[in-house]
């Protein structure tokens, strides 16, 4: 059984995952699931820290032009689900979110500089590394079926009234 990290009904994920977004020159559906942990997997993310962290992440997503689909903060790890543009690199996304949230959280909660230890201060709240996975509404089987069905067909359809070309529909 696969563990669900996000409650699909709470976040309306089925609708959000299937939404195709538009940029100036393309249609896209790029969703990333990130997971990262505090240094030493300390159970520090509790109480008011959770609310402040969610606000920081929400603000950082807006600044980066990401659609925040879901965020869950556990005492010892964070799950973040975002929809990105094709120009957004997952490594850059997580670097900015981890760096910014570490800095801001430790300004608001100075006790996080010590990660719960009495003496030593640490330069970062988060452990090195992260998990990232991609998710979408189109399965590999759907893409393969679409490609095989397109043999001998034109790649683009042309709308004579609007003068627009459009790429075929993967969702069938």
Q: Positions of the model-derived regions?
A:
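Basic nucleic-acid-binding interfaces
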Residues: 2-172
């Amino acid at each position: 059984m696969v563990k669900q990290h996000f409650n699909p009904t709470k976040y309306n994920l089925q609708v959000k995952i299937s939404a195709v977004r538009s940029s100036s020159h393309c249609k896209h559906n790029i969703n990333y699931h990130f997971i990262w942990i505090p240094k030493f997997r300390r159970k520090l993310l509790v109480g008011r820290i959770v609310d402040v962290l969610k606000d920081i992440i929400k603000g950082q997503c807006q600044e980066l032009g990401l659609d925040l689909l879901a965020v869950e903060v556990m005492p010892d790890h964070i799950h973040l689900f975002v929809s990105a543009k094709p120009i957004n690199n997952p490594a850059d996304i997580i670097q900015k979110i981890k760096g910014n949230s570490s800095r801001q959280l430790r300004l608001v909660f100075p006790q996080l500089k010590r990660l719960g230890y009495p003496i030593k201060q640490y330069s970062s709240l988060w452990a090195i590394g992260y998990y990232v996975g991609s998710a979408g509404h189109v399965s590999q089987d759907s893409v393969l079926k679409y490609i095989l069905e397109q043999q001998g067909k034109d790649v683009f359809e042309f709308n004579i009234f609007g003068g627009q070309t459009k790429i075929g529909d993967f969702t069938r």
